């Protein structure tokens, strides 16, 4: 195995993303309850990363011939570019599978069930005999479900109670991820062309995403988070648009990580007194708006 393959492979490059998605649930739970367990978080995050690392390498094995012809992917698809041999990849898949399963099992029943569901859905997506990734609609549904489970995993590491869990926001994030995934699968060549060719998927998913985002704004007690996300996302998206033409498609990874960090940072800022006070003020306005809408509906 070549030295560059330690970093430039699907398992390593996707590990930070999976950890950030896992930490989303942890941050939400901790911000609401104040409870956390560092050791449990580290073990669970390691288990999820290793288990998914095995899946990514398995996926690369099944896509070996296809990836060799893809100029966008070849630089970081270590099996396709020869940085990792097929035999080494098989050993890594076995080791990561065992360690990922063990660490996830040690993290508790709730987390292990979610871990098992994530792995099962990924196998449905990639396994040659099933290969749902070949079906346009089914693949997006599976990808969305996987993201819902990953964003939820950190929460259910500590509890099986849904009270306070922002599931509409999680659904919105997961659908948004599925849309970005569709963009990525088409090699990020031309957004307008991708939207036009996939409008039967893009438009309904976009509607679902914004609908659940709107529901989240009125249902949960952190409206300032949505404003922070919006405020930090606009310049990030602008920078992405300007830099993509100069840096190429590799900037997509940086943009994806920036988006996840923005979301986590926005929730973490709720611990700052000034931000908390602003959130309470916005929450009061939100309550007033809901009362006005309620009275308007009842007096029709």
Please report, for each region that a protein language model flagged, where it lies by residue.
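Multi-pass membrane catalytic core of lipid/isoprenoid biosynthesis enzymes
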Residues: 64-116, 171, 199-222
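Topogenic membrane-insertion module of multi-pass membrane proteins
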Residues: 1-72, 81-94, 117-121, 125-126, ...
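C-terminal membrane-associated helical module and adjoining short loops/tails
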Residues: 3-8, 12-15, 148, 153-300
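Membrane-interface helix caps and helix-loop-helix hairpins in membrane proteins
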Residues: 105-106, 129-137, 154-163
């Amino acid at each position: 195995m070549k030295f560059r393959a330690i970093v430039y492979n699907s398992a390593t490059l996707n590990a930070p993303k999976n950890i950030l998605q896992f930490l989303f649930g942890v941050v939400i739970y901790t911000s609401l309850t104040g409870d956390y367990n560092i050791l449990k978080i580290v073990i669970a995050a390691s288990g999820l990363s290793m288990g998914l690392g095995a899946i990514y390498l398995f996926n690369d094995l099944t896509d070996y011939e296809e990836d060799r012809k893809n100029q966008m992917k070849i630089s970081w698809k270590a099996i396709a570019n020869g940085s990792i041999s097929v035999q080494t990849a098989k050993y890594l898949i076995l080791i990561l599978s065992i360690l990922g399963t063990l660490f996830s099992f040690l993290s508790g029943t709730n987390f292990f069930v979610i871990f098992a569901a994530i792995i099962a859905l990924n196998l449905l997506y990639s396994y040659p005999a099933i290969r749902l990734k070949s079906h346009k609609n089914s693949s997006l549904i599976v990808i969305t479900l996987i993201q819902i489970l990953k964003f939820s995993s950190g929460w259910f590491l500590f509890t099986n109670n849904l009270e306070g869990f922002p599931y509409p926001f999680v659904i919105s994030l997961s659908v948004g991820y599925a849309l970005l995934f569709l963009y990525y699968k088409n090699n990020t060549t031309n957004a307008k062309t991708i939207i036009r060719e996939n409008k039967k998927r893009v438009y309904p998913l976009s509607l679902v995403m914004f609908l659940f985002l709107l529901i989240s704004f009125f249902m949960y007690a952190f409206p300032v988070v949505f404003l922070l996300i919006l405020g930090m996302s606009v310049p990030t998206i602008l920078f992405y648009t300007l830099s993509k033409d100069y840096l190429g498609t590799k900037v997509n990874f940086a943009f994806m990580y920036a988006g996840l960090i923005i979301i986590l940072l926005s929730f973490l800022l709720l611990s700052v007194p000034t931000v908390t006070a602003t959130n309470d003020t916005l929450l009061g306005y939100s309550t007033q708006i809901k009362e006005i809408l309620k009275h308007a509906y009842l007096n029709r």
